[in-house]
């Protein structure tokens, strides 16, 4: 996608915003803006807020690079706004973004595609704190928040139900705990890049994802070819059944003792992190793309109505 007279497009870097993941979004936006400038693009950094429409009208960008995370940025809201303004934007569109953000509905889509998922129920927060709504071990998380914010693990020997924070919504997802290795695959367009094995001291939480040294990434994962092929296939099918575009990242758990039957899909992230410790840029680099080239590819892939 080119700007006026065949020049590189002018890019508005949408970052920050009001969600719980604001700080990660700011980090993502700064890194992507720096990388794009290194590729020759003019980039204007925009801290997305109530005056976003006025800011975009003033900037008149050719492309909006969506570096927002969490609510409003990856749930279809800002995508709908950009469609209304007719500004081509990166990453997934309105429907795919909204669907992926809603864990219950995205699981329903995965099931229709024959993808293996973990059993779960949606329950009232009050009920979850009063009793075990499913047998431990299980995980409690918001149905529509990302980056493992507010996730609770209830272990098998736990007698008392979890006491959830005030930040947790009135309705939460209670999901059977999936044992095994945490792995992830980035899809770029119609290509699954590689499998990363994520090694941490415990649950892959918000700190492990975004803090330097919070986790160790092994790529390609040291797993049998059969499992790697399944991860690639499942990630690509998840990307397609949700209707994603640009890049997405799908997370898995694999219980080695059960072989191929032990691989389950956890969720797909339509706005994967783009920070120095992020998984998708590492996978792109593994297949020969620099961070700057990955960001430039996203800009060239930007569009409306798909």
UniProtKB/Swiss-Prot annotation:
Its cofactor is Mg(2+); Mn(2+). GO terms for cellular component: cytoplasm. Binds 2 magnesium or manganese ions per subunit. Pathway: Cell wall biogenesis; peptidoglycan biosynthesis. Residues 107-300 form the ATP-grasp domain. Pfam families: Dala_Dala_lig_C, Dala_Dala_lig_N. GO terms for molecular function: ATP binding; D-alanine-D-alanine ligase activity; metal ion binding. It comes from the Bacteria. Mg(2+) 1 binds at residues 251, 267. InterPro entries: ATP-grasp, ATP_grasp_subdomain_1, D-Ala_lig_Van_CS, D_ala_D_ala, Dala_Dala_lig_C, Dala_Dala_lig_N, PreATP-grasp_dom_sf. It is an enzyme of class 6 (ligase). Its EC number is 6.3.2.4. Keywords: ATP-binding, Cell shape, Cell wall biogenesis/degradation, Cytoplasm, Ligase, Magnesium, Manganese, Metal-binding, Nucleotide-binding, Peptidoglycan synthesis. ATP binds at residues 134-184. GO terms for biological process: cell wall organization; peptidoglycan biosynthetic process; regulation of cell shape. It is found in: Cytoplasm. Mg(2+) 2 binds at residues 267, 269. Belongs to the D-alanine--D-alanine ligase family. PANTHER family: D-ALANINE--D-ALANINE LIGASE (PTHR23132), D-ALANINE--D-ALANINE LIGASE B (PTHR23132:SF23). Cell wall formation. This is D-alanine--D-alanine ligase. The gene is ddl.
């Amino acid at each position: 996608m080119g700007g006026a007279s065949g020049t590189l497009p002018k890019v508005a870097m949408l970052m920050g915003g009001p969600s719980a993941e604001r700080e990660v979004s700011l980090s993502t936006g700064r890194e992507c803006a720096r990388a794009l400038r290194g590729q020759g693009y003019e980039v204007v950094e925009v801290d997305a807020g109530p005056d976003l429409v006025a800011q975009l009208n003033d900037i008149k960008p050719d492309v909006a690079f969506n570096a927002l995370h969490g609510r409003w940025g990856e749930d279809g809201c800002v995508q709908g706004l950009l469609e209304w303004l007719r500004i081509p934007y990166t990453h997934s569109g309105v429907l795919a973004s909204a669907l992926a953000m809603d864990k219950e509905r995205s699981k329903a889509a995965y099931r229709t595609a024959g993808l293996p998922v973990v059993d779960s129920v949606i329950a009232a927060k009050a009920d979850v704190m009063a009793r075990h709504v499913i047998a431990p071990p299980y995980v409690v998380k918001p149905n529509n928040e990302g980056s493992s914010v507010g996730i609770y693990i209830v272990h098998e020997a736990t007698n008392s139900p979890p006491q959830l924070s005030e930040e947790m919504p009135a309705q939460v997802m209670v999901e059977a705990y999936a044992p095994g290795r945490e792995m992830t695959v980035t899809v770029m367009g119609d290509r699954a890049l590689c499998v990363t094995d994520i090694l941490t001291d415990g649950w892959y939480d918000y700190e492990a994802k975004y803090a330097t040294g919070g986790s160790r990434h092994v790529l390609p994962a040291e797993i049998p070819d059969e499992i790697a092929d399944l991860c690639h296939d499942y990630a690509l099918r998840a990307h397609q059944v949700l209707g994603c575009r640009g890049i997405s990242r799908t997370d898995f758990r694999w219980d080695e003792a059960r072989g191929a039957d032990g691989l389950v899909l956890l969720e797909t992230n339509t706005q994967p992190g783009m920070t120095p410790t992020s998984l998708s840029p590492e996978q792109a680099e593994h297949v020969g793309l620099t961070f700057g080239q990955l960001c430039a590819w996203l800009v060239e892939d930007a569009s409306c109505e798909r």
